């Protein structure tokens, strides 16, 4: 597993976010087709992600996938019609709280806000590939997507955002509260705006392209 790349400066990150290699990679990522919500969830969060959850009475992948499929199916119309940042942020926040509550009920352990948001944002990242979405809906959702915060997207900001007190081994569990989560998303969004790209491009640069 490659180590997270720590971006040397904001200007370096801006240049990388907007270069042709990144833009081509993003285009290829979102050209994938997911016919069903099941496909979105299964391809969005793979088995390796669940290794962080150990010694549970129920397989963590089962708990998450059942919850995610049900949640997305029940809120499909709402999610498909979201068209502004505030509504999208509320949707992600409420879904994360729902996941954390379900997780505690079934596993008798704490998911944690940061880990819950990361898993759900991975699903939402892939949700833009759902074939039933119109081109306009797809692009709107890509523009609104939040960055899944894990070791790659968190540690990548260590030198750019020293006020976040990121260590070299920070993981998705580093984010504890909604306010902390919002601070990360705001910093990433501001940098992405300077590059003229959606915030989710940072995740694709830090994670997907870092694992080529």
Give, region by region, the residue ranges found by the protein language model.
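C-terminal accessory module of base-excision DNA glycosylases/AP lyases that mediates lesion recognition
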Residues: 1-43, 96, 100, 108-212
């Amino acid at each position: 597993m490659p180590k997270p790349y720590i971006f040397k400066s904001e200007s370096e990150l801006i240049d990388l976010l907007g270069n042709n290699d990144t833009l081509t990679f993003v285009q290829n990522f979102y050209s994938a087709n997911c016919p069903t919500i099941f496909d979105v969830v299964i391809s969005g969060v793979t088995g390796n992600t669940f290794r962080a959850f150990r010694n549970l009475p129920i397989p963590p992948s089962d708990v998450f996938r059942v919850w995610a499929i049900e949640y997305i199916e029940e809120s499909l119309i709402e999610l498909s019609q979201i068209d502004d940042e505030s509504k999208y942020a509320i949707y992600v926040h409420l879904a994360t709280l729902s996941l954390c509550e379900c997780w505690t009920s079934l596993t008798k352990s704490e998911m944690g806000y940061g880990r819950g948001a990361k898993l759900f944002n991975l699903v939402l990242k892939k949700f833009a590939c759902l074939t039933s979405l119109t081109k306009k809906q797809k692009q709107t959702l890509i523009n609104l997507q939040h960055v899944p915060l894990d070791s790659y997207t968190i540690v990548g900001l260590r030198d750019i955002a020293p006020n976040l007190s990121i260590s070299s081994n920070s993981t998705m569990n580093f984010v504890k509260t909604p306010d902390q989560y919002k601070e990360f998303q705001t910093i990433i969004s501001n940098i992405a705006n300077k590059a003229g790209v959606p915030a989710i491009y940072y995740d694709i640069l830090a994670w997907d392209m870092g694992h080529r």
